[in-house]
């Protein structure tokens, strides 16, 4: 059970917290609010910080969908997206779902796995609103879903056919931009860095039939010390690609 502060008089919040096994704690560092049909996370000792929400419909995520470079994006190349090839993807470290959304918007079917229940609750709420949206709702319902389990091992028991497993473990950020600082400060204080991230590679390789893609900061070492087959570099990050079989 994960401690969280919330308004116990609000049935919607009570239901969400019960669903994700979040237990009320008057002294919890974090608060969940439900306002304007949106679930948001707040750090109670930093009231000036905006709440964190998952929003697939507006803002930066929507802008990237419309103007982000389509299949030419490095992430699309990394997962093997090309003409006639729409791989099924498991995002094993979904976070706020941004990379998963990019892949879904390009045609992949994406199953998100998120082990922290507060983050999973935010994801589920973002999906709920996206599914109802007139512009993106139809394909979102077809292509993007949240797995109600906290690990790749749990997912593997469903015996899904998965082409690609995508991993973006939380790594201590050096970036000083205001947005990254704000979101990452709240996020990292909630979930912490993925100190056991090296343990993700083996189950990912067991689950994926075609490849595993690991997003890393450019200064980070290889995950679990395993050298990738190929690396796609961007300005600040790189995608390490572990190939098991050709994309068809």
Curated annotation (Swiss-Prot):
Pfam families: SAM_MT. Keywords: Cytoplasm, Methyltransferase, rRNA processing, S-adenosyl-L-methionine, Transferase. GO terms for molecular function: rRNA (guanine-N2-)-methyltransferase activity. S-adenosyl-L-methionine binds at residues 98-99, 114-115, 150-151, 168. GO terms for cellular component: cytoplasm. It catalyses: guanosine(1516) in 16S rRNA + S-adenosyl-L-methionine = N(2)-methylguanosine(1516) in 16S rRNA + S-adenosyl-L-homocysteine + H(+). It is an enzyme of class 2 (transferase). The keyword Repeat does not apply. The keyword Transmembrane does not apply. It is found in: Cytoplasm. Its EC number is 2.1.1.242. Specifically methylates the guanosine in position 1516 of 16S rRNA. Belongs to the methyltransferase superfamily. RsmJ family. PANTHER family: RIBOSOMAL RNA SMALL SUBUNIT METHYLTRANSFERASE J (PTHR36112:SF1). This is Ribosomal RNA small subunit methyltransferase J. The lineage of its organism: Bacteria, Pseudomonadati, Pseudomonadota, Gammaproteobacteria, Alteromonadales.
């Amino acid at each position: 059970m994960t401690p969280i502060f919330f308004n116990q008089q609000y049935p919607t919040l009570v239901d969400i917290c019960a669903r994700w096994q979040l237990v009320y704690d008057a002294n919890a560092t974090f608060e969940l609010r439900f306002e304007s049909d949106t679930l948001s996370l707040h750090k109670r000792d930093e009231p000036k910080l905006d709440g964190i929400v998952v929003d697939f419909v507006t803002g930066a995520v929507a802008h990237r969908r419309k103007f982000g470079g389509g299949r030419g994006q490095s992430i699309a190349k990394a997962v093997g997206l090309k003409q006639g090839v729409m791989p099924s993807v498991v995002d094993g470290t979904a976070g706020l779902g941004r990379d998963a959304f990019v892949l879904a918007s390009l045609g992949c079917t994406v199953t998100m796995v998120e082990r922290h229940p507060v983050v999973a609750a935010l994801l589920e709420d973002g999906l709920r609103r996206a599914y109802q949206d007139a512009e993106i709702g139809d394909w979102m319902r077809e292509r993007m879903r949240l797995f109600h389990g906290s690990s790749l091992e749990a997912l593997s028991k469903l015996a899904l056919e998965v082409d690609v497993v995508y991993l973006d473990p939380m790594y201590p950020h050096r970036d000083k931009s205001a947005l990254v600082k704000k979101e990452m400060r709240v996020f990292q204080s909630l979930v912490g860095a993925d100190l056991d991230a090296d343990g993700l590679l083996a189950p990912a390789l067991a689950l994926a039939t075609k490849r595993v893609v690991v997003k890393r900061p450019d200064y980070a070492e290889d995950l679990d010390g395993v050298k990738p087959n190929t690396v796609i570099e961007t300005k600040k990050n790189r995608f390490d690609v572990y190939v098991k079989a050709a994309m068809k």
